[in-house]
Amino acid sequence: MARVKTGVVRRRKHKKVLKLARGFYSGRRKHFRKAKEQLERSLVYAYRDRRRKKTDFRRLWIVRINAACRLNDLSYSRFINGLKKAGIELDRKILADLAMNDVAAFAKIAEAAKKAL
């Protein structure tokens, strides 16, 4: 039986890894072993940060809502409690957008939350 060398398979594998490593710095882009190691690490970071992004955005929205609440003489926790008691079901993303872009509408919502307390 003839001996089969891995030439075609190896070249295809190396091309695939080096293509994904485009944009990496120095040898991490050009050398297969370094590129492969960096690519594995990069994919781990990407996986982790896709999940972390949701937490980061929620924290950002809470900071923005809290800042707008303070302008309306409310704390964030009392504001959220007031919204629940008033039966207003707006999520934090929408509330943060209103706080940034439509201050008057947010002030009305804050007043409704104050009355419900």
Swiss-Prot record:
Gene3D superfamilies: 6.10.160.10, Ribosomal protein L20 (1.10.1900.20). Pfam families: Ribosomal_L20 (PF00453). GO terms for molecular function: rRNA binding; structural constituent of ribosome. Keywords: Ribonucleoprotein, Ribosomal protein, RNA-binding, rRNA-binding. SUPFAM superfamilies: Ribosomal protein L20. Signal peptide: none annotated. One of its GO terms (biological process) is translation. The keyword rRNA-binding applies. GO terms for cellular component: ribonucleoprotein complex; ribosome. NCBIfam families: rplT_bact. PANTHER family: 39S RIBOSOMAL PROTEIN L20 (PTHR10986). Binds directly to 23S ribosomal RNA and is necessary for the in vitro assembly process of the 50S ribosomal subunit. It is not involved in the protein synthesizing functions of that subunit. Belongs to the bacterial ribosomal protein bL20 family. HAMAP family: Ribosomal_bL20. This is Large ribosomal subunit protein bL20. It comes from Campylobacter jejuni subsp. doylei (strain ATCC BAA-1458 / RM4099 / 269.97).
